[in-house]
UniProtKB/Swiss-Prot annotation:
Known function: Catalyzes the isomerization of L-erythrulose-1P to D-erythrulose-4P. Involved in the degradation pathway of L-threitol, that allows M.smegmatis to grow on this compound as the sole carbon source.
Family to which the UniProt record says this protein belongs: Belongs to the triosephosphate isomerase family.
Protein name according to UniProt: L-erythrulose-1-phosphate isomerase
Protein species of origin: Mycolicibacterium smegmatis (strain ATCC 700084 / mc(2)155)
Catalytic activity line of the entry: L-erythrulose 1-phosphate = D-erythrulose 4-phosphate
Length: 263
């Protein structure tokens, strides 16, 4: 697998997190078929990545193979390298198991597991220290949106997590904008018009300084092409639409055919 420190050539990032889904057999089968697909049809200008469960991490790593262009991530990691943190997995341990990306700050972790601005900052710093790519998830609630506070809220989330980083560090960070009201089984797909302002705001602050600005939230094969067409969007972070390989492959193909992949 490629070294995360050497990334950045891809024009579009297309990834999926499996959340708490898929056992070892299903994970292995998905990864093997994906490895075969990208070997036969490399998606030019596109960086694929998948984020399985911790228990399937090494299984997926082995199924993808050493030379796979597909990057592998974890859904969370602790900032300390080791210690009395029962139930946690450190960034260092995740890297040792094959991870190249660390998903940080997903809204479900903020809501259910007490993730804060401070812990996201610590995790981003730890990921960078160990040469992994932090995938920082930010997004506002429906209440924030209705109050007209979307841009302020997401910019504050990003600023808190990225505080103190140099431009060299920021160049190794991915930001995924995932409005809470648009994600999950009951999420409402955001319209292109609803997404223009948030991405304009993020691009003004971080667009040329980070590795990429991704969108996640009810992404599927019907809307992926339109979402990629939004100014400043340089990738998609997909949920259930990519949990079956044909859906993920279809979106990879859309991305590879998109003008942004050829820029």
């Amino acid at each position: 697998m490629p070294d995360a420190r050497a990334l950045g050539a891809a024009q579009l990032w297309i990834g999926t997190s499996w959340k708490m889904n898929k056992g070892l057999a299903e994970s292995r089968g998905y990864a093997r078929e994906l490895a075969e697909y990208v070997a036969a049809k490399p998606p030019a200008g596109v960086q694929p990545f998948i984020i399985p469960s911790f228990t399937a991490l090494t299984t997926v790593r082995d199924a993808l193979g050493d030379d796979s262009p597909v990057l592998l991530g974890v859904q969370n990691a602790h900032w300390e390298d080791h210690g009395a943190w029962t139930g946690e997995v450190s960034v260092a341990q995740a890297k040792d198991a094959g991870a190249q990306i660390v998903e940080i700050g997903h809204s479900e972790r903020r809501e259910h597991f007490g993730e804060t601005v401070e812990t996201t900052r610590l995790k981003v710093a730890a990921a960078l220290h160990h040469g992994l790519v932090p995938l920082l998830c930010i997004g506002e609630s429906a209440e924030n949106k209705q109050a007209g506070e979307s841009s302020r809220f997401i910019l504050e989330q990003a600023a808190g997590a990225l505080e103190g980083l140099t431009d060299e560090h920021l160049a190794r960070v991915l930001i995924a904008y995932e409005p809470i009201w648009a994600i999950g089984e009951n999420g409402r797909p955001a319209t292109v018009e609803e997404l223009r302002q948030p991405f304009d705001d993020l691009a003004r602050e971080y667009g040329c300084r980070t590795m990429g600005l991704l969108y996640g939230g009810s992404v599927n094969t019907d809307n992926a092409e339109d979402l990629l067409g939004i100014d400043h969007v340089t990738g998609l972070f997909i949920g259930r639409a990519a949990w079956q390989l044909p859906g993920y492959v279809r979106i990879l193909e859309m991305a590879a055919a998109h003008p942004k992949a050829k820029a």
